């Protein structure tokens, strides 16, 4: 379960994560701009199992230090990238889970071709996650053909009449 906790841009809240934790034993990703050390301790304290590190907003030292801190706190880390250069930077910390965000941060357009194009830069022993723009069966099939291990899906579930049924359907594909 991915939970937005960033308040200013995405209207998330740490209380949302606490509420989810009280109702579910599934792993929870804290989705936020993780730029301060205290956020990692807070993530652990509120029940997160994983955090998001966004390569585009961190320098190499921050990436390394935050990754190490998260692992010391026994938090999994999804390292988010947007292009070849960011993947190269991310690989320096040898992450177990690496994601490609299909949203262009400059103009906010989304194309799943980003996942296809960048897949070859991520070693097969990494968990490869496609992020953003996954809206229907066709998108799921396309990303499976791209050898994607997992998906980070938000809007499609939020807009679905029965998100649980949609998740089961896509998992079975």
Language-model regions, residue ranges each:
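Catalytic cores of alpha/beta
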Residues: 35-47, 84-93, 130, 134-153, ...
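C-terminal helical cap(s) of enzyme catalytic domains, especially alpha/beta-barrels
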Residues: 117-121, 144, 159-173
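Catalytic-face loop-and-helix region of soluble metabolic enzyme cores
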Residues: 97-153
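N-terminal active-site wall of soluble small-molecule enzyme domains
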Residues: 2-78, 84-89, 115-118
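Active-site beta-loop-alpha junctions enriched in small/polar residues
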Residues: 6, 33, 56, 82-84, ...
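Conserved strand-to-helix beginnings and helix N-cap segments that scaffold or border functional pockets
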Residues: 13-14, 63-64, 111-112, 140, ...
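Short, conserved beta-strand edge motifs with alternating hydrophobic and charged residues
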Residues: 78-81, 99-101
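Glycine-rich phosphate-binding active-site loops on the catalytic face of alpha/beta enzymes
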Residues: 42-62, 100-107, 147-166
């Amino acid at each position: 379960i991915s939970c937005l906790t960033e308040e200013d841009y995405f209207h998330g809240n740490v209380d949302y994560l606490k509420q989810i934790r009280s109702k579910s034993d599934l792993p929870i990703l804290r989705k936020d701009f993780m730029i301060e050390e205290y956020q990692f301790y807070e993530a652990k304290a509120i029940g997160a199992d994983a955090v998001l590190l966004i390569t585009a907003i961190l320098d190499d030292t921050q990436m390394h230090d935050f990754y190490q801190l998260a692992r010391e706190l026994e938090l999994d880390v999804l390292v988010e990238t947007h292009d070849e250069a960011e993947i190269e930077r991310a690989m320096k910390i040898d992450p177990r889970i690496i994601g490609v965000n299909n949203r262009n941060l400059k103009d906010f357009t989304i194309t799943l071709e980003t996942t296809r194009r960048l897949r070859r830069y991520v070693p097969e022993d990494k968990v490869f996650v496609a992020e953003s723009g996954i809206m229907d069966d066709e998108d799921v099939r396309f990303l499976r053909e791209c050898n994607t291990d997992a998906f980070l899906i938000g809007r499609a579930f939020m807009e679905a009449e029965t998100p649980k049924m949609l998740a089961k359907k896509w998992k079975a594909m």
